[in-house]
Design a protein with these regions (language model features):
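A glycine-rich beta-to-alpha transition motif near the start of alpha/beta enzyme domains, typified by
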Residues: 1-103, 108-110, 123-245
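Glycine-rich ThDP/TPP pyrophosphate-binding loop and its adjacent helix/strand module
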Residues: 115
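Glycine-rich phosphate-binding loop plus the immediately following alpha-helix
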Residues: 118-119
Length: 245
């Protein structure tokens, strides 16, 4: 992903023939270090590209797509005007709170799944402001924290071969939602508020009675870009109370 005009924080998408007959197209996500089960902001980008380049049948005002990826089938709605994308929303795979009130080195966090496992850390306990000047501090802290989490906690999806916490979201509460910075275990700083991470946060908030069904949650990256998310229904994954975000 670093050549010819890439960089270490970039996510790429390999478009392939789907296995599922329901899907319009298959997507294999990757970054500069590994394959990725699911990426929310890349799903938005792929869907925009498919519509804007007429790689799928475009229907106005909304083009419906089903993308198949390692995490499962993702249903996407692309709002279209004059043949171009205006906005993108997607229905993610079932997401759930795996474990709450975890602790490593006096840092409290919760673990949620939404295509990948995320550690969710309230940054108020760290006394570090979430801003661009502290990005490298969070990067170093995040990489070390994820290593220790995976050494201490036995994290396993009940039905899929996914068994690592690969991202950490540090967040502050704001007046209308939350502000965050997301770090991967390789030290990649997410360029967006993180779509998959937003779904993980929805699962945590819903299961801890901090968010209601269909209530809009605004998740903002430290640069000001924001995603909106909501819980559209409840479901269950093995023993876990899950949601469809």
């Amino acid at each position: 992903m670093c050549e010819p005009r890439g960089h270490k924080d970039m996510v790429g998408a390999l478009l392939v023939e789907p296995i599922s007959k329901e899907a319009d197209i298959g997507v294999i996500y990757m970054d500069a270090n590994r394959w990725i089960n699911m990426c929310g902001y890349a799903t938005i980008g792929v869907s925009m590209t498919l519509v804007n380049e007429n790689l799928v049948k475009v229907v106005e005002p909304v083009t419906h797509l089903i993308l198949e990826m390692a995490a499962g089938l993702i249903h996407v709605d692309v709002e279209v005007e004059d043949g171009k994308t205006k906005s993108v929303s997607f229905e993610n795979i079932p997401s759930f709170l795996f474990e709450e009130n975890c602790l490593v080195n006096n840092i409290h966090f919760d673990i949620s799944y939404s295509g990948s496992f995320f550690a969710l850390v309230d940054a108020d306990q760290l006394d570090i402001e979430i801003n661009i000047n502290n990005a490298n501090k969070f990067k170093e802290l995040g990489v070390n924290l994820l290593r220790q989490i995976n050494e201490k906690y036995d994290v396993k999806h009940p039905t899929l071969p996914i068994n690592r916490v690969v991202n950490v979201e540090f967040y502050h509460k704001t007046d209308d939602g939350q502000k965050n910075i997301v770090i991967s275990e390789e030290g990649i700083i997410d360029r967006s508020p993180c779509g998959t991470g937003t779904c993980a946060k929805l699962a945590y908030m819903y299961n801890t009675n901090k968010l209601k069904l269909n209530e809009i949650f605004i998740n903002q990256r430290f640069t000001g870009v924001s995603f909106k998310g909501r819980v559209i229904e409840e479901t269950k994954i093995d023993k876990y109370k899950a949601i469809i975000p």
